[in-house]
């Protein structure tokens, strides 16, 4: 507990006015294998060129997620792609410190709180370390994901992909590969219970609310994520295969990012930081709100199957316990559900895109059965 950033934040000299870029990798195959614009793999490539190690979140055989270090570019598929659940850190901080003390270059990626934790553990800055923090929405307990899988598929899932691009970058599709060889594609919030409650923060852990690490200055040398909303600013580019936002939070991060050659991008453009629209909340430290359905869901999921717990939590009777002073009523009628819902959004924390996500979640919830 001596180095837990929740008790002792590490010193932070990063800028509050960082340079921001919209980028797309030129390698079509790499882009296909990446959740957004492929920049994480391009940064990792520079680390491997220095005989360095790369740290990040990887799937385990039991479909839990853990942080690992890899030493070969051929192992990058383990670290690519979004994982919308908490990763097990184990002794990864100690592993990183050992590599650094041995003189090896390390590129380490994680949620902002994980980067702050690593920096607190190390106690000082290492010139041979580059940290990447992610534009993170929230990080639900891994137990929720395990329950969702077990209730929906038993032990038949061989692999799971949160951000399948079969229908495009912004399709929000999940791909579930069963041990029988069957592949199931679900269109995110509209067809999948887990995606629905992830994106409207019904699973948001209490410690993710008002996250102190998701603000400027950031704790990582570099911040990366999806550049949602960029098509409205620069409609002349093709974003169907994904685009990344890159924020260089200090000179070291900028210098490392600049090592990637222009030829490795089809798009690399410096843009105003305020252009970060759909992910802009992750720079403000105030958008990790708790869904008004969270307490009901936490209660129901203890005894009910996952999808049914979501349905019960979203039922109209659960809305009565929400303090009216926090609510902004929005009438929504769904022919599918067959009755009128009163949807409520957090007036100060919920933007229009998240309102649409909540509506999509509620209108399609009965498709899961």
Predicted regions and their residues:
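Iron-sulfur cluster-binding cysteine motifs and their immediate structural context
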Residues: 1-16, 221-222
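Cysteine-centered iron-sulfur cluster-binding motifs in ferredoxin-type domains/subunits
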Residues: 1-7, 38, 113, 204-211
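Extended interfacial segments that mediate partner engagement and assembly in macromolecular machines
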Residues: 14-41
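Low-complexity, highly charged intrinsically disordered N-terminal segments
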Residues: 35, 40-62
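Long, compositionally biased charged/polar accessory segments in the mid-to-C-terminal portions
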Residues: 50-53, 155-369
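Glycine-rich phosphate-binding "P-loop"
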Residues: 64-94
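Short, charged, surface-exposed secondary-structure boundary motifs
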Residues: 66, 139-148
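A short alpha->loop->secondary-structure connector
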Residues: 123-135
């Amino acid at each position: 507990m001596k180095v837990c950033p929740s008790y002792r934040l590490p010193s932070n000299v990063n800028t509050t006015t960082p340079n921001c870029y919209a980028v797309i990798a030129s390698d079509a195959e790499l882009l296909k294998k990446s959740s957004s614009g492929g920049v994480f793999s391009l940064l990792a490539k520079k680390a491997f060129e220095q005989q360095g190690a790369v740290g990040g979140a990887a799937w385990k055989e039991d479909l839990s997620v853990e942080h690992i270090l890899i030493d070969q570019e051929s192992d990058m598929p383990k670290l690519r792609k979004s994982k919308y659940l908490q990763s097990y850190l184990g002794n990864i901080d100690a592993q990183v410190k050992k590599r650094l003390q041995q003189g090896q270059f390390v590129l380490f990626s994680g949620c902002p709180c994980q980067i702050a934790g690593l920096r607190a553990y190390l106690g000082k800055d290492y010139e041979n370390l580059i940290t990447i923090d992610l534009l993170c929405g929230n990080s639900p307990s891994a137990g929720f994901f395990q329950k969702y899988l077990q209730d929906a598929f038993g032990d038949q899932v061989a692999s799971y992909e949160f951000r399948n691009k079969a229908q495009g970058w912004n399709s929000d599709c999940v791909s579930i590969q069963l041990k029988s060889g069957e592949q199931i594609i679900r269109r995110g919030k509209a067809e999948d219970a887990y995606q629905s409650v992830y994106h409207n923060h019904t699973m948001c852990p209490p410690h993710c609310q008002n996250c102190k690490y998701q603000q400027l200055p950031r704790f990582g040398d570099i911040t990366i994520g999806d550049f949602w909303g960029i098509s409205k600013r620069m409609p002349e580019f093709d974003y169907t295969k994904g685009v990344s936002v890159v924020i260089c939070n200090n000179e070291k991060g900028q210098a490392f990012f600049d090592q990637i050659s222009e030829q490795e991008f089809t798009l690399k453009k410096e843009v105003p930081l305020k252009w970060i629209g759909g992910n802009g909340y992750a720079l403000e430290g105030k958008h990790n709100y708790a869904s008004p359905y969270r307490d009901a869901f936490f209660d129901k999921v203890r005894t009910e199957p996952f999808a049914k717990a979501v349905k019960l939590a979203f039922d109209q009777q659960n809305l009565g316990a929400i303090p009216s002073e926090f609510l902004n009523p929005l009438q929504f009628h769904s022919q599918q559900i067959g009755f009128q819902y009163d949807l409520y959004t957090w007036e100060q924390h919920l933007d229009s895109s998240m309102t649409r996500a909540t509506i999509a979640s509620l209108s399609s919830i009965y498709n899961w059965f």
